[in-house]
Amino acid sequence: LVKEKNLESNIHVKTYPFVKNLRYGENPHQKASWYGLNNIGWNAAKQLQGKELSYNNLLDLESALSTILEFEYDQKQNSSENTNAAVILKHNNPCGAALADSPSDAFRKALDCDSTSAFGGIVAFNNNVDLAAAELLSNIFLECVVAPSFDKEALKILHNKKNLRLLQLNKENIKKD
């Protein structure tokens, strides 16, 4: 139509390959599908356990990642300037964010911001999730936890929460715009 009418178009359309169908759309009765580039962003994340992701999970994960990337992501473990950040979101709204010397302290402080709203939320860490953080995470109902890595001991604790979605997203797979 644009060509037929000799109109100029400022619309640009991109297409992406199908990744998979999601658990559900914005509401449980709606269907949703996921399209994206290989090895970039959430398409490159490794889901370590839990139910299939929903549309809302992806929205919350993207918001959580956007916030956590304000801090250095996946720092060297023994860095003297290692700042651990934790962010909690639910329904695309922040419930808490905090910095601390350890992932567990960062999560505890973020949870203290609004522990009621954090119930059923998404948690993002900028560094490895260790045993102490996993023990705290296991005490609350959460939809997803995303981090650059998880200790083996942390995975053992979190494995008991079968429906909890654990996602590992490596620094090199984060899309930079």
Describe the predicted segments one by one:
Residues 1-177:
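Active-site loops and adjacent core secondary-structure elements that bind or stabilize anionic groups
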